[in-house]
UniProtKB/Swiss-Prot annotation:
Its EC number is 4.1.1.11. It is found in: Cytoplasm. Its cofactor is pyruvate. It holds the Pfam family Asp_decarbox. It comes from the Bacteria. This is Aspartate 1-decarboxylase. Pathway: Cofactor biosynthesis; (R)-pantothenate biosynthesis; beta-alanine from L-aspartate: step 1/1.
Length: 137
């Protein structure tokens, strides 16, 4: 049996641009892609914290060190520059693989610079007033 598990997550990234007339996808800074274990063309889910919309698209590699989080194509109707988003990739694992799998969690600041890396899915952004997801009722 395969289980679908979280593989990579960029938490609370700020959307830098949205272009309705660009070929559909999400452009992500290559540094963030590496940290979250994402590859060009990989399917990701994008959760818009600002308005609650969720969408599925694929990744395009953005300029390294630029902080770019660009929403392209039809998804630009659901996400606007300045919105906070969570970008999530999943992987299918056997039970044996699941036992040793560690997700890649990337926390970023308002400029999409990496502030912390980890594998705890419930850990809040360091230095924020967020509560751990593990502590919620």
């Amino acid at each position: 049996m395969l289980r679908t598990m979280l593989n990579g997550k960029i938490h609370r990234a700020t959307v830098t641009h949205a272009d309705l007339h660009y070929v559909g996808s999400i452009t992500i800074d290559a540094d963030l892609m590496d940290a979250a274990n994402l590859v060009d063309g990989e399917q990701v889910h994008v959760v818009n914290i600002t308005n609650g919309h969720r969408l599925v698209t694929y990744v395009l590699t953005g300029e390294r060190g630029s902080g770019v989080i660009g929403i392209n194509g039809a998804a630009a109707r659901l996400v606007a520059p300045g919105d906070l988003v969570i970008i999530i990739s999943y992987v299918q694992l056997t039970e044996a693989e699941r036992a040793t799998h560690r997700p890649h969690v990337v926390h970023v600041d308002a400029n999409n610079r990496i502030v912390a890396l980890g594998d705890d899915l419930a850990e809040p952004v360091p230095g924020s007033d967020q509560k751990s997801g593990a502590l919620l009722p």
